[in-house]
């Protein structure tokens, strides 16, 4: 077996490049890594244990909470509160933010926003799911309680972001603002190993990912772009391939590696978009830009520039290969 760098070693090496680093962000990533391993274990035995299906409640979005949603949320919350470097958590599964009020946590510099199990409705049919996370420095004074304003920061202020995809293998992909790197979990060793160094999103691709079942509800520009993707034009490699899993992490991960575009636009049923700005759009937009791609909420509207006004704010999302995103926005800008 080829020896490669583990996630822990990679984090330490990266930390050593910054003489003023305190190690707190590294400790935060250790918490995410630990919770990811625990969720990986449960996802992999979902067909054998009584953790599939709905938990009997709704989250703040009005969506049925799946049992694994609740489980993953609790495990990430426990792991992130344990080390005292995070002062608060906002989760798609929580009505409001969660303040960690232990004495060490009050001194914590960071807040974390998380979708603990994206695409969990697919668990029952054995489709890949994932965790999405976003990290910010708190803007309130350390030593005091975390505030709502600590979470309502634009995506440009993210210190780090990433996701874990639980599929045929489990992979953690993250960025701290200097490129994107991916680590594949080796269950025999219990470690994440560097498998995708300096990931780059191709500027062009031949995959478009959109829920075409909602076509009738889409704005005319999106409809025109979908037709453009379906037209035959050999010089440009069209028609493109349609691939839509229904799990943002899985669709984004594929398009990041192979090149492609993911669209979840506004619609007559979701006039503000459906995806959550803070838990889904911002972290994925951060990764896309770090990998050379683009992420827009509309024409000339980068996702990362949006100033949020509420925790569970929704946003449209057009993300992926830069030239494909630009082309989609050409159609959106047509009168």
UniProtKB/Swiss-Prot annotation:
Task: Give cofactor(s), names only.
Answer: Mg(2+)
Q: Quote the InterPro entries the UniProt record gives.
A: FBPase_C_dom, FBPase_class-1, FBPase_N, FBPtase, Fructose_bisphosphatase_AS
List positions binding Mg(2+) 2: 115, 118, 280
Q: What are the binding positions for substrate in this chain?
A: 118-121, 211, 244, 262-264, 274
Catalytic activities: beta-D-fructose 1,6-bisphosphate + H2O = beta-D-fructose 6-phosphate + phosphate
Q: Where in the cell is it found?
A: Cytoplasm
EC number of the protein? 3.1.3.11
Alphabetic keyword roster: Carbohydrate metabolism, Cytoplasm, Hydrolase, Magnesium, Metal-binding
**Cofactor binding: number and manner:** Binds 2 magnesium ions per subunit.
User: What's an example GO BP annotation here?
Assistant: fructose 1,6-bisphosphate metabolic process
Q: Does the keyword Nuclease apply?
A: no
For Mg(2+) 1, which residues are the binding ones? 92, 115, 117
Q: In which pathway does it act?
A: Carbohydrate biosynthesis; gluconeogenesis
Instruction: Answer yes or no on keyword Cell inner membrane.
Output: no
Q: Where primarily located?
A: cytoplasm
Which GO CC annotations does the UniProt entry carry?
Answer: cytosol
Molecular functions per Gene Ontology: fructose 1,6-bisphosphate 1-phosphatase activity; magnesium ion binding
Q: Which family does it belong to?
A: Belongs to the FBPase class 1 family.
Q: What does the record note on quaternary structure? A: Homotetramer.
What is the protein's name according to its record? Answer: Fructose-1,6-bisphosphatase class 1
Organism lineage string: Bacteria, Pseudomonadati, Pseudomonadota, Gammaproteobacteria, Cellvibrionales
**GN (gene name):** fbp
């Amino acid at each position: 077996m080829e020896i490669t760098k583990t996630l822990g070693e990679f984090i330490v090496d990266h930390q050593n490049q910054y003489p003023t680093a305190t190690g707190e962000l590294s400790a935060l990533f250790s918490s995410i890594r630990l919770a990811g391993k625990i969720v990986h274990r449960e996802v992999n035995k979902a067909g054998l244990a009584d953790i599939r299906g709905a938990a009997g409640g709704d989250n703040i979005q009005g969506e049925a909470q799946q049992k694994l949603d609740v489980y993953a949320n609790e495990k990430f919350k426990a792991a992130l509160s344990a080390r005292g470097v995070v002062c608060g958590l906002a989760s798609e599964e929580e009505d409001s933010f969660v303040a960690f009020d232990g004495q060490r946590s009050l001194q914590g510099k960071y807040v974390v926003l998380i979708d603990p199990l994206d695409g969990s409705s697919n668990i029952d049919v054995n489709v890949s799911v994932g965790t999405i996370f976003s990290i910010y420095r708190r803007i309130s004074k350390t030593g005091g309680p975390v505030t709502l304003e600590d979470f309502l920061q634009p995506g440009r202020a993210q210190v780090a972001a990433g996701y874990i995809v639980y599929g045929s293998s489990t992979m953690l992909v993250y960025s701290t603002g200097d490129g994107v790197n991916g680590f594949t979990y080796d269950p025999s060793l219990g470690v994440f190993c560097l498998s995708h160094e300096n990931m780059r999103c191709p500027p062009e691709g031949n995959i478009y990912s959109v829920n075409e079942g909602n076509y009738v509800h889409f704005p005319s520009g999106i409809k025109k772009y979908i037709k453009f993707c379906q037209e035959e034009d050999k010089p440009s490699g069209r028609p493109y391939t349609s691939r839509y899993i229904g799990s943002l992490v899985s669709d984004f991960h594929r398009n990041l590696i192979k090149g492609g575009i993911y669209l979840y636009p506004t619609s007559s049923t979701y006039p503000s978009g459906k995806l959550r700005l803070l838990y889904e759009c911002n972290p994925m937009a951060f990764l896309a830009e770090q990998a050379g791609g683009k992420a827009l909420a509309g024409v000339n509207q980068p996702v990362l520039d949006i100033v949020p006004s509420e925790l569970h704010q929704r946003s449209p999302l057009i993300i992926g290969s830069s030239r494909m995103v630009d082309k989609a926005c050409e159609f959106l800008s047509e009168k």
